[in-house]
């Protein structure tokens, strides 16, 4: 049906205000499972150290009645190990005239962008801590680097035939990746048994998104069903968030920022993020018609005793 001639419509009008929602939708992931589950502490040097120790092997030798002590057990010294701090930062520069304008979804552009940088920085830190990266002392032209999980876990592992564990298990060298293969329940059981034998009690199985779905399909996980009344919606459970092994219960945690090819079995009590400088915002010198700032943190990974943890490595990523 045609409109009456000379009807003035919204297609002709020039003064209609735009309709822009006062909400900004951002679903970028920012969960950081490793940082959320392990502790944090402060350090006072770019190289921070700690000590590890272990008990002597079990001795079943019987002692004769009234026997004198003529020899003594050997005493092993503690092992001193350490890691370097790692500086991560995010920067921004925002023109001054932005705050003179009517902005949708935020009142202050710089504050909004700084909040974003903080979330981005936490994601960066998560990727560094879970990486297969050896520690580096750095110098005036090369940045220091902290050793990630991949450079620490060496005692309790399951890897491909051509993969190798870090030789020093002190963060000074990274593992060598091998041929990728499918994650299986037997691999997880193997590492849990190794950790138990070593004295560890991992409670978290941290995997990438693909291998989270693989864990949910383990044959050892019993099918779960709810009774479905005819007049109610039915819930179908297709995921595993807890895995009960012969040597303890594991909380299955997906991590978007770790390497998909690694599966970590962790005891949160034996790892922490050490901060020389915690995450903080710094306003930079103003040199023009704009505000400059950065969000910065200096931190390192402390693995109190790597034998408390384990890993399944060289996994397929799709």
Question: Model-derived features: where do they sit?
Answer:
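Flexible, glycine/threonine- and acidic-rich loop/arm segments that mediate assembly and lattice contacts
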Residues: 1-318
């Amino acid at each position: 049906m045609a409109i009456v001639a000379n009807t003035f419509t919204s297609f002709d009008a020039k003064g209609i205000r735009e309709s822009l929602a006062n909400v900004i939708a951002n679903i970028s992931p920012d969960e950081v499972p490793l940082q959320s589950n392990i502790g944090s502490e402060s350090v006072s040097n770019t190289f921070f150290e700690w000590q590890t120790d272990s008990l002597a092997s079990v001795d079943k030798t019987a002692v004769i009645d009234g026997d004198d002590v003529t020899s003594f057990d050997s005493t092993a010294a503690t092992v001193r190990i350490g890691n370097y701090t790692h500086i991560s930062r995010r920067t921004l520069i925002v023109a001054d005239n932005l705050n003179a304008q009517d902005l949708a979804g935020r009142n202050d552009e710089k504050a909004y962008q700084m909040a974003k940088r903080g979330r981005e920085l936490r994601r960066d830190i998560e990727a560094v801590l879970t990486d297969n990266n050896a520690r580096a002392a750095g110098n005036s032209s090369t940045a220091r680097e902290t050793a990630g999980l991949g450079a620490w876990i060496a005692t309790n592992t399951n890897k491909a035939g051509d993969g190798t564990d870090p030789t020093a298990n002190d963060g000074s060298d990274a593992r060598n990746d091998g041929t990728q293969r499918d994650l299986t329940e037997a691999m997880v059981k193997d590492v849990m048994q190794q950790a138990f034998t070593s004295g560890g009690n991992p409670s978290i199985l941290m995997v990438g998104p693909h291998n989270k779905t693989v864990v949910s399909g383990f044959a050892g996980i019993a099918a779960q069903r709810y009774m479905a009344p005819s007049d109610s919606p039915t819930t179908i459970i297709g995921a595993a968030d807890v895995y009960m092994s012969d040597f303890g219960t594991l909380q299955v945690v997906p991590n978007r920022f770790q390497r998909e090819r690694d599966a970590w079995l962790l005891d949160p009590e034996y790892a922490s993020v050490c901060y020389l400088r915690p995450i903080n915002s710094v306003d930079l010198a103003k040199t023009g018609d704009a505000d400059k700032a950065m969000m910065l943190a200096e931190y390192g990974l402390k693995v109190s005793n790597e034998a408390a943890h384990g890993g399944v490595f060289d996994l397929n990523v799709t």
